[in-house]
């Protein structure tokens, strides 16, 4: 049991955090602003080498009493921490989050007003090109790099639409297996042959050139009154001659359940692409929750309850989970609350988002090993496919693979520094207790089994945690949303009228799309996900392992590994920042410049 003095200390911490009071002044933004009772400045050491082992035993005992598994938030997914220590940790993270977001919050409303004035001076939204006024020379503080180059000029191109599936949201599309997968829907073969150099739909399928994206799960969700959406499924294909990755057909699965192709009238096909993008925007924001926050948190919670803060693995995880426990409660309170930010813009109500997060978590997104960077892409036939030709360009994989490699290299040096002999893993009771706790009590899905005896297993687990926190999260969230995946008019959050009952009936797309007020509302909501001060605050990806509270407790080999990691991330960032369009008007095979994944622009932690 906790003694009275322990409880008094914990209670005072909770009050200070809840009120946002500075408990420890003078901290940088990217370091914890206050210490929890089990924090300290001891060098990291394994339990069998600790010269004060009784302190560790007492610390872990108090942790098991103070960090408890509470009910999930934002859907029925993984546990959310509670208990005396859990509540204090959440309050600390929320206070840090509000400080972190203050800069954007203070600037978003003046910039909203500025964009509104510019739009009014331009005469409002009179055509599809009018939406560009909302972005051009706007949001200079909250989105200093602006919208991705090409997104406002090339948005009608089919290649931009299809290549978004391989860059800004690569988590939906999969290759259809010629023998294991049936064709999900039919398309007129005369149309397919015209688009695919004479190949039929069946031929594309048999050749392993056919890909499928499925958002039909959105069909049963009730819609927000006065707003409409589709629940699209779509085919994409590798062209037999050019090798380009292109769209083939989009089926709405709602209303008259029309199937559109690039052979349809211009407005019909644009409408279909907008409908798909709307579904994709919904997916990206909820999938990222189920795939990153909901997976990383229980792994860390298990460590909090089984490992001393002196354990190097616990230190590694603590560094990644900076501010992590702010997101779900703040999301419940401000974003997915009844009538909150989400409800103000999207076609599906907040509870539909929570329902999808729940379904996605249990079906696949929450599975730890299956969502490994390489494994997930391999399983969907996107890399090293044995039953179809390779993708000519895969921007997500090509850009992120070197980042993952840098993470793995640092993590290998970290693990080998503390486990020079793998037999040490067998006698590390805290390590083994963590693995058991994660699977049995924290109920992490598809986690590594106990006992953990191979260093490569630990390297894989820790590297995947770093990938989830620092890369996977921001591939779908952060700057990506405001720079690309949520940019109007191609990516609306809702339609203003029901889907067309027949093709050939759209004289103008404007009646379906956001008016001036709704367009500004969507833009201002999505820029809030950006964190423009990250790099100068040393909170960006290159600084993932640079925190003084982390490095000071390690030795020279890890300091050297951290320096190499940081330099590699800077080099990757430099390469991304140098990207330009080639003589064909393409970058990485796309008619837009994808820079939102720049390591200098994305946090190393789960910030939104």
From Swiss-Prot:
Note on how the cofactor is bound: Three His residues, the carboxyl oxygen of the C-terminal Ile or Val residue, and a fifth residue, usually Asn, ligate the metal, which binds water to form a catalytic base Mn(2+)OH(2) for hydrogen abstraction.
Transmembrane annotation, as ranges: none
Enzyme class: oxidoreductase
Domain Lipoxygenase: 29-608
Cellular localisation: Secreted
The keyword Magnesium belongs to this UniProt entry's keyword annotation: no
GO biological process, one term: lipid oxidation
Protein keywords: Dioxygenase, Glycoprotein, Manganese, Metal-binding, Oxidoreductase, Secreted, Signal
Residues carrying sugar: 76, 154, 214, 515
Signal peptide annotation: 1-20
Reactions it catalyzes: (9Z,12Z)-octadecadienoate + O2 = 13-hydroperoxy-(9Z,11E)-octadecadienoate
Alphabetized SUPFAM superfamilies for the sequence: Lipoxigenase
Listed Pfam families: Lipoxygenase (PF00305)
GO molecular function: linoleate 11-lipoxygenase activity; metal ion binding; oxidoreductase activity, acting on single donors with incorporation of molecular oxygen, incorporation of two atoms of oxygen
Any single GO CC term annotated in Swiss-Prot or TrEMBL for this entry: extracellular region
Entry's EC annotation: 1.13.11.-
Cofactor: Mn(2+)
Family: Belongs to the lipoxygenase family. Manganese lipoxygenase subfamily.
PANTHER family: LIPOXYGENASE
Role, per record: Lipoxygenase that metabolizes linoleic acid to 9- and 13-hydroperoxy fatty acids. Specific towards 13-HPODE yielding 89% of the total HPODE.
Name of the protein described by the UniProt record: Manganese lipoxygenase
Organism whose genome encodes this protein: Aspergillus fumigatus (strain ATCC MYA-4609 / CBS 101355 / FGSC A1100 / Af293)
Lineage, opening ranks: Eukaryota, Fungi, Dikarya, Ascomycota, Pezizomycotina
């Amino acid at each position: 049991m906790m003694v009275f003095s322990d409880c008094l200390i914990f209670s005072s911490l909770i009050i200070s955090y809840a009120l946002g009071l500075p408990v420890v002044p003078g901290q940088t933004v990217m370091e914890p602003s206050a210490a929890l009772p089990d924090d300290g400045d001891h060098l990291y050491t394994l339990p069998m080498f600790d010269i004060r082992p009784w302190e560790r035993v007492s610390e872990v005992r108090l942790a098991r009493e103070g960090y408890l598994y509470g009910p999930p938030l934002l859907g029925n997914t993984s546990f959310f921490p509670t208990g005396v220590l859990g509540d204090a940790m959440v309050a600390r993270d929320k206070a840090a989050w509000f400080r972190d977001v203050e800069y954007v919050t203070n600037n978003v409303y003046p910039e909203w007003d500025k964009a509104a004035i510019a739009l009014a001076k331009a005469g409002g939204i009179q055509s599809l090109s009018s939406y560009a006024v909302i972005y051009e020379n706007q949001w200079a503080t909250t989105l200093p790099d602006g919208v991705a180059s090409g997104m406002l000029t090339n948005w009608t191109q089919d290649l931009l639409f299809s290549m978004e599936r391989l860059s800004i949201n690569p988590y939906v599309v999969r290759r259809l297996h010629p023998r294991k997968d049936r064709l999900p829907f039919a398309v007129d073969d005369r149309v397919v042959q015209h688009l695919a150099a004479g190949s039929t739909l069946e031929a594309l399928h048999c050749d392993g050139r056919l890909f499928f994206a499925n958002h039909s799960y959105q069909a049963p969700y009730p819609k927000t009154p006065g707003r409409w959406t589709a629940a699209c499924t779509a085919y994409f294909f590798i062209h037999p001659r050019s090798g380009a990755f292109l769209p083939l057909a989009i089926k709405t699965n709602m209303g008259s359940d029309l199937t559109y192709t690039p052979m349809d009238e211009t407005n019909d096909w644009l409408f279909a692409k907008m409908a798909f993008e709307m579904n994709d925007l919904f997916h990206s924001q909820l999938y990222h929750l189920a795939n990153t926050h909901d997976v990383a948190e229980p792994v860390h919670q298990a460590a909090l309850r089984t490992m001393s803060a002196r354990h190097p693995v616990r230190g590694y995880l603590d560094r990644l989970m900076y501010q992590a426990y702010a997101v779900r409660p703040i999301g419940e309170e401000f974003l997915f609350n009844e009538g909150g930010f989400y409800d103000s813009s999207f076609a599906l109500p907040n509870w539909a988002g929570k329902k999808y997060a729940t379904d996605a978590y249990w079906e696949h997104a929450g599975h730890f090993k299956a969502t490994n960077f390489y494994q997930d892409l391999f399983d969907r036939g996107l890399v090293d496919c044995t039953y179809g030709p390779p993708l000519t360009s895969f921007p997500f994989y090509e850009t992120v693979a070197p980042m993952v490699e840098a993470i793995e290299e640092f993590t290998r040096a970290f693990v080998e520094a503390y486990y020079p002999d793998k037999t040490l893993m067998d006698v590390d009771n805290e390590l083994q207790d963590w693995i058991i706790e994660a699977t049995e009590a924290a109920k992490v899905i598809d986690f590594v089994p106990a006992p953990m005896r191979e260093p490569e297993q630990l390297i894989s687990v820790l590297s995947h945690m770093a990938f989830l926190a620092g890369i996977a999260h921001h591939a779908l969230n952060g700057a990506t949303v405001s720079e690309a995946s949520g940019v109007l008019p191609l990516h609306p959050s809702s339609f203003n009228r029901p889907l067309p009952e027949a093709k050939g009936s759209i004289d103008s797309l404007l009646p379906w799309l956001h008016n001036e007020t709704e367009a500004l509302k969507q833009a201002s909501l999505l820029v809030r996900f950006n964190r423009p001060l990250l790099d100068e605050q040393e909170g960006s990806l290159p600084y993932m392992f640079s925190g003084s509270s982390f490095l000071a407790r390690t030795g020279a080999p890890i300091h050297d590994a951290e320096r190499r990691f940081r330099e590699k991330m800077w080099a990757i960032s430099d390469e991304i920042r140098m990207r330009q369009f080639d003589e064909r008007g393409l970058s990485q095979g796309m008619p837009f410049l994808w820079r939102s994944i720049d390591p200098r622009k994305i946090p190393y932690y789960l910030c939104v």
